[in-house]
Structures are given as structure tokens and as C-alpha cells.
Amino acid sequence: MYIVVKWVCPHHQAEAFAKRVVEGMKEYPDDETIVKPIIDGAMTAKKDGFHVTGIAEIINGKTKEVFDLVNKRNLFIIQGLDGMKYSVETAYSRNEALEIFGLQI
């Protein structure tokens, strides 16, 4: 299972957001006993701002711990930044999704 974090950062907040991300990663670093980063901040520029996506694999049985870490980090990062949006979702791996339908590779 994966955790997918998506951010939308208004253009005028880009520098402040980048600084907060660096600070947030220091304050709440990834814990490789519960999560393994896959994509660490892929960014695209769009009309409404910069869209940033991070994807990490959740270690079996550590979903709550990962959500706690990610939400603490996200709340730290957005503090004082107007116009920021973010979402946190889970996604199944291909094999996990196939198992739901009784299939295997």
C-alpha cells in the first residue's frame, strides 16, 4: 500500500513553501521502519500554482504511524502559508488491487 501526498502551492508562496518543506523534513523526517519514499516531490507548474506529489510505500501494519507522521509534517509546513491545499490518500499496489478481485500475478 502507498501513501500519496499532493500539494497545490500558489505561485507567490513557492519560496516560502520550499523553505517550510525543508524545515518540515528536518522536524518530521521519514522513518524508514514505517515508510519507504518512492517519489519524493515530483512537481509540475500549472496556472493555479505548483502541484507537488510525493508517493511512499507503507510498511505492512504501519498505516496509522505513517498517517500520523505525514499529517504532523503537513500541518507544520502549511502553518502561516495562505492559499495552500493538500490531500493525503492511500493507493493499492497492482498486486494488492488484483487480490481484491481474487487475482494474482
Question: What are the residue ranges of the model-derived segments?
Answer:
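Short S/T/G/P-rich N-terminal loop/turn motif that feeds into the first structured element of a domain
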Residues: 1-69, 89-105
